[in-house]
Structures are given as C-alpha cells and as structure tokens.
C-alpha cells in the first residue's frame, strides 16, 4: 500500500515560509509566486493506493503529476507531508536505506529522458543541481566544468 498524507512541494528559496503563508493567509498560487518567488508544484495531496489496485493520476500538462510521483521514491523531497510504502515511512530512510528501498521496493520509468529543448546544453546539465536547490552560481560553475 502507498499512503500519501498532506504532501506539499513548493519550489523556491524559502518553501517553508511560503507554505506557512499559504496556511495562515490562504494564499493562492499566483500570490505565492508574487510574494515568495516560489511555485507550488504539489498542494496538500492525500491518497491511498492498495496493493494490486490500478490507480490513475490525471491532469493537464504541468499540473504536478510527475512531481507528485517523484516523491514516492524521494527523487524530490516534499516541503511537507508524509509518504509510506508497504508500511515503510519513506521520509525517515537514510541514504543507504533509501538506495536499498529503491532497489528492492520501487521503480520508476521516466516519461521523457531527452534533453529539454527550451533549455541550453548548460542548463540541461545543471538541471539536476537545480532540483537539488544548489545555488545558480554553483550549479552553472559545476555544469561548465563538466562540459569543458
């Protein structure tokens, strides 16, 4: 069984502050972007998927489907919430345990493994660092070094 409870993902420099403002002042996505320069990728998702159940996550392009699923194996870390898979609290796993969990309990096939055409080669190479929230200067320096 997969259980997801209260999962949020906010992309930006201060995601926790943005989430606090959302909860305290009922801010919408546009207000979060304007006030915190942050993007709400996943907003308060709750779901349970039983073993063997066929479960469909549907939505428009860019609505957060893949972002949500990437939390199941912690390719993305949620800003808030909990995720449990077959009784294992995924959020409490250390790096070694997480690798073992990914190897034995969960897999993922990416929907698109090509370069992103709207990004430069440098930006494509730097993207994994962006996801890890490395500063722009550091990720550009590291990506340029790799490409050199």
Which residue stretches match the model-derived regions?
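Helix-to-loop junction immediately C-terminal to a conserved catalytic motif
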Residues: 73
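Conserved ABC ATPase "signature" region
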Residues: 20-31, 86-89, 130-133, 137-148
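Short coil-to-helix segment of the ABC ATPase nucleotide-binding domain corresponding to the Q-loop/switch region
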Residues: 119-126
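Conserved coupling/switch loops of ABC nucleotide-binding domains, chiefly the family-specific signature
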Residues: 79-82, 138
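The feature captures the beta-strand-to-loop junction immediately N-terminal to the Walker
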Residues: 58-60
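ABC ATPase NBD coupling module
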Residues: 32-37, 90-106, 131, 136-140
């Amino acid at each position: 069984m997969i259980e997801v409870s209260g999962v949020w993902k906010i992309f930006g420099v201060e995601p926790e502050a943005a989430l606090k403002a959302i909860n305290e002042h009922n801010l919408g996505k546009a207000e979060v972007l304007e006030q915190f320069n942050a993007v709400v990728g996943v907003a308060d998702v709750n779901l349970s998927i039983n073993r063997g159940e066929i479960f469909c996550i549907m939505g428009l392009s860019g609505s957060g489907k893949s972002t949500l699923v990437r939390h199941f194996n912690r390719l993305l870390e949620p800003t808030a919430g909990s995720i449990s898979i077959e009784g294992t609290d995924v959020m409490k796993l250390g790096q070694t345990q997480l690798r073992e969990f990914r190897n034995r309990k969960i897999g993922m096939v990416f929907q698109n493994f090509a370069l992103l055409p709207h990004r430069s080669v440098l930006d494509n190479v730097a993207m994994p660092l962006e996801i890890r929230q490395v500063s722009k200067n550091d990720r550009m320096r590291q990506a340029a070094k790799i490409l050199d």
